[in-house]
């Protein structure tokens, strides 16, 4: 999503959330 590019500083948090959502 575009907001991910806007907040690269929270990339780790987003990645963690996405991982939880996918599993």
Swiss-Prot record:
Swiss-Prot/TrEMBL keywords: Thioether bond, Toxin
Record location of the Cyclopeptide (Ala-Pro) cross-link: 2-8
Processing and modification events after translation: Processed by the macrocyclase-peptidase enzyme POPB to yield a toxic cyclic heptapeptide. POPB first removes 10 residues from the N-terminus. Conformational trapping of the remaining peptide forces the enzyme to release this intermediate rather than proceed to macrocyclization. The enzyme rebinds the remaining peptide in a different conformation and catalyzes macrocyclization of the N-terminal 7 residues.
2'-cysteinyl-6'-hydroxytryptophan sulfoxide (Trp-Cys) cross-link, renumbered residues: 3-7
Superkingdom assignment: Eukaryota
MF-aspect GO terms: toxin activity
InterPro entries cross-referenced by the UniProt entry: Amanitin/phalloidin (IPR027582)
Prodomain positions: 1, 9-23
Function: Major toxin that belongs to the bicyclic heptapeptides called phallotoxins. Although structurally related to amatoxins, phallotoxins have a different mode of action, which is the stabilization of F-actin. Phallotoxins are poisonous when administered parenterally, but not orally because of poor absorption.
Family: Belongs to the MSDIN fungal toxin family.
Protein name as annotated: Phallacidin proprotein
């Amino acid at each position: 999503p575009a907001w991910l590019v806007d907040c690269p500083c929270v990339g780790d948090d987003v990645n963690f959330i996405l991982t939880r959502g996918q599993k």
